Design a protein with these regions (language model features):
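Extracytoplasmic/periplasmic/luminal assembly and interaction segments
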Residues: 29, 33, 37-89
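Low-complexity intrinsically disordered segments
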Residues: 73-144
């Protein structure tokens, strides 16, 4: 019986640690995405092509990470709200270019099948995030 209590305590501790780490990761993804997104949104017209592509790649990577992370079922409401807020803005700034980037990567024959499967999951997560955060988002008139 005491051994069962030890194992249950370990399981509870591990779940709590995983839950907390997952929430902190959501905040980290949002904060890592914030700076390049603000720079890109404010200076896109003044950037040269190489800078624009570099910032777009960084932002797309952050959007993909956030879209995948928001699918975790035990994500805290506040952490998900912070992530969703920034992801919604990022998806508006980048538009369909994010999905196109990952579709082109998936269509490439140079990528192994395992990575193509991961890319397909990323594209599905991006599509779901776009529907939830852009298409189904309440309009300004509906919020008032």
């Amino acid at each position: 019986m005491p051994l069962a209590l030890v194992f249950s305590a370990i399981a509870v501790f591990e779940f709590g640690a995983r839950y907390g780490a997952t929430n902190m990761q959501a905040y980290a993804i949002a904060s890592e995405l914030k700076f390049p997104l603000n720079v890109f949104a404010q200076n896109e017209a003044n950037m040269d092509n190489s800078s624009k592509e570099y910032f777009a790649m960084m932002i797309d990577k952050g959007i993909a990470a956030g879209a995948m992370h928001r699918q975790i079922w035990y994500l805290d409401r506040d952490a998900q709200a912070a992530l969703d807020s920034l992801l919604g803005y990022a998806l508006k700034v980048r538009g369909d270019a994010v999905t196109e980037r990952y579709a082109l990567m998936e269509a490439s024959e140079d990528i192994p099948a395992l990575n193509q499967t991961k890319l397909a999951k990323i594209r599905e997560a991006l599509a779901e995030a776009k529907v939830d955060l852009i298409d189904k988002a309440p309009k300004v008139a509906e919020q008032e």
